[in-house]
């Protein structure tokens, strides 16, 4: 055992929870794509997404409970808190986007909605890849690559939003 190993926490619970949260984000994004690929029974599909979101909340609570009772953590407690909150927010925002379909009584999605959902799904997959590399940090270039790809996907989503808004206001009736 090296000197460094004596002072480095060997507990993997946080990394397990990060990976669980990232997997839940992938599940939520896949469910969002499912909603748009077959826009029928939207309420039932949304309830399935809501169940995924509740699973994410439970994982978030476990992570914060663990953080509150762990003295020596593998990362700074503030970093753990930020990562846990950010991963939870991904799922919460996916849930909120799907909920608005029901709130606004969207009867037929436009062509941009599925593209947004697929972009979100790709981002969630990158998050999962990046988070899985945190455990060992043997290849930080993979994490960096995931961050760069997530930024690229954000730019794609920005372009989609611009195109969707342009399309909306070029139609005869921007309300419907």
Name the predicted role of every residue range.
Residues 1-176:
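Cytosolic, long alpha-helical scaffolding segments
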